[in-house]
Amino acid sequence: MKPVQLTIDGRSVSVSPELSILEAARLNDISIPTLCFHEALAERGSCWLCIVELKGQNRFIPACNTKVSEGMVVETDNAELRGMRRQSLERIIDQHCGDCLGPCEISCPAGCNIPGFVSAIATGRDRDAMAIIMETIPLPGILGRVCPAPCEDACRRHGVDDPVSICALKRFAADRDAAAPEPFMPERKVGSGKKVAIVGAGPGGLTAAYYLLAAGHGVTIIDAHEQPGGMMRYGIPRFRLPAEVIESDIRPIREMGAEFMMSTSFGSDTDWTTLSRDHDSLLLSVGASVAARMGIPGEDAPGVVSGIEFLKRAAEGDAGEAGKTVIVIGGGNTAVDAARTALRLGAESVTIMYRRSLEEMPANSLEIGEASAEGVELRLLTAPTEICSDPEGLLVRAVEMRLGEPGVDGRRRPIAVEGSDFVLKADLVIAATGQAVQVPASGLPGLGIRQDGTVMVDEVSMQTELPGVFACGDCVSGPELAILAVGQGRRAAQAIDRFLTGLPFEKPPAVFNSSYGERDHAPAPFYERAKPASRVDVPELSPSERRRSFEEAVTGYGREDAVSEARRCLQCRCRAIDSCHLRELAGEFGITSSMESRPDGEFAIDGTQGARFEREKCVDCGICVRTLEQASSGTADFRVLIESCPTGAISG
């Protein structure tokens, strides 16, 4: 059959007259969007995304259903076509309902594929679980113990019974791997010959080091402490985070060749001028290790110590005895850690004094509960006004508080109750009312510093005002969670890698994300389909066993418990997220979200026939129906249906 000549986007092409415009375009590497087209099917759908313009005829036609003809002039892309396609896509998206990413994954500052590693544990694939975790969190043993788990707050399992113990499962994977004959090591690219200096051996700096080393770059880590780990080592007590766990997480970084310059203060012992002689870039990742002042008389009296200093001395084995009576001032994790540490150092009475209510205490609620179980007393709505030296120790003058109107931060302001003054005696007062960043700017002349003392960086590149100098972690965000520093460390490593390889910095493209919305907003049948199963308790020492011991208080899951807990996961993450054509097209057309999506009809997930069909994700493209109709037997292999579904409505 004689070929026909036509013009597509100004290009003259010669094709068989049996082809559609869409097939002719694809044959010539011209892309036309479509959801309902499948090359193996004779019958076509009607998504109207493949609409094109016939020039000279002022006609808009579907490219998948229109045969080519001699002399045809086709335009596949212009502003009018894009507008029409976007309208069609928005109509289709309105029919599509479900979560692209699980709420747990969205809430994780590091962006960890939580459903992925939990599923791997549930099916006994420990190595796969570790590999998935290490894609975003290279310190899993540490974070599996100390992360406050915003992911668990977001877990949709709340709508059934209790959230999945995500952190404990991450710890399980890390501990299993650490005990394996050959622990996980990432594949490392060929050496680039480039070298990066990292100032700070805390979560952000270690994370950046891990990914830069894996990318083939050399890394030198500079830190003022004797050992790496930053506040994870010197600010978190050993009964929560054993030193051997820190070493286990750092092992891959050492084995990939990182150089450590410990007991080295940046700015006094070395600076960027010196380091730049044999380093191509620098990352500043210092933590918030300076104690905030309380602003009351007597806070510098003998017997008053900051929470940071107290925990550091305890980590170094130099804290001495705490005395019989200890008062800790503050309500964060440092305050709770200091109180629990004081008990283990022999204190008979430990009191946490906090100026707001229990609901507003920023410390992890689990840690507060464990402290209370060990015998720590909470004196809430109480604030110190003065600390005085006394022949028998210290006197803490305090006042009762009430909560007033919300301040600029949205929190209700504590107000002193007139005439409520009282005095408490103490042998030791630990001040843990906050932390601040002290950037070693003397080592980086010209570094831009904000009024709050944090470093100014470009939001996209994380580069400072100094070329080749980047920053991440607390020195950028202010005092924050370790998991946030991990997320920033990975982003910084990616940006530095682009800098070292000469690639331009690029803002990540906006990605479409369909979601049922907030944690409890999925359709009722979504929760009802799950069988109730109580959260598996994480084994721990009893309060009487642990209150005088620095042995790790929480002992962690064994295999049976871990698998049982992992199987509670609802697997909210779409199974087709990496191959969803609808998500890809939505991103191309700048449609970034479909929040609070709801099924038009009855919610249904059917997994009884060997494949899983989720009706609410179906956009009626018709590919599966046409596949079955075209098959001579009226049946088709599920794998064919799964691979051809453009939205993940059919999955394995």
Regions found by a protein language model. Give the residues of each.
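FAD-site-proximal beta/loop scaffold in flavoenzymes
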Residues: 300-323, 409-479
